[in-house]
């Protein structure tokens, strides 16, 4: 599981940063890519990665400001042109369906795959297939805006092979049955419960990806005990008033949310073009006294999300 940042800038593209988009790479987990926001030129950014558009299974839009959606029609068309046939689902605020359908109709674009929409009106669960669960909550922005919490299901514990060998259990199909938690009767009459030979389950990973927002309780709820929080940092830590007026956050406010939520790693994105070079990295440096594992992400950064130790 990895996060790959395709655009980390705020408002409009700059030479250093494209506008908002981040890919959650779930190739090992479900052979799929999930995108969060699709700013202008996202498909061009993808050309500089190993992402294949036909692998994109779901797209989650935080809100309908242009820097988060202007790349969507082009990406959808290219996915079709490149041979995509698998269904794709777009989640987002009310209006996302009309925006996409109008863009495709006016441009007379035809897609080679089924396109589904889930328009969000309130907080709640969007998706749950027992492998992953996605929850959306409203944030505090100028227009309807949502954050997303992605929860991976716990992984079953490992089969304790040494314990089986100690009890002289013959290897073979029996091991598979025990690993599945089944009760097995051996040729010598012994009855074994598979649960007695399975280790502690591996907790699933949790990621929170937020859209543009002021500080809000829902941000804490979304990020509660997350392994990674992706939070906007449009303004530096001392620009609290400006952040409030523009419905955005400072780096310090993002770190405070992470601290209250018990987050392990904070990734700051949605960086204003006013912060370049060292000034951008200062956004993270200034708040590491709150969350030590904080970094400002750049376009094309890839962040591994390991299992909890």
UniProtKB/Swiss-Prot annotation:
Kindly provide the name given to this protein in its UniProt entry: Ribonuclease Z
For binding Zn(2+) 1, which residues are annotated in this chain's numbering? 63, 65, 141, 212
**What is the purpose of this protein?**
Zinc phosphodiesterase, which displays some tRNA 3'-processing endonuclease activity. Probably involved in tRNA maturation, by removing a 3'-trailer from precursor tRNA.
The family annotation for this protein states: Belongs to the RNase Z family.
Positions binding Zn(2+) 2 in this chain are 67-68, 212, 270
Which Pfam families would you find in this protein's record?
Answer: Lactamase_B_2 (PF12706)
Database matches in CDD domains: RNaseZ_ZiPD-like_MBL-fold
InterPro entries in the cross-refs: Metallo-B-lactamas, RibonucZ/Hydroxyglut_hydro, RNase_Z/BN
Do the record's keywords include Metal-binding? yes
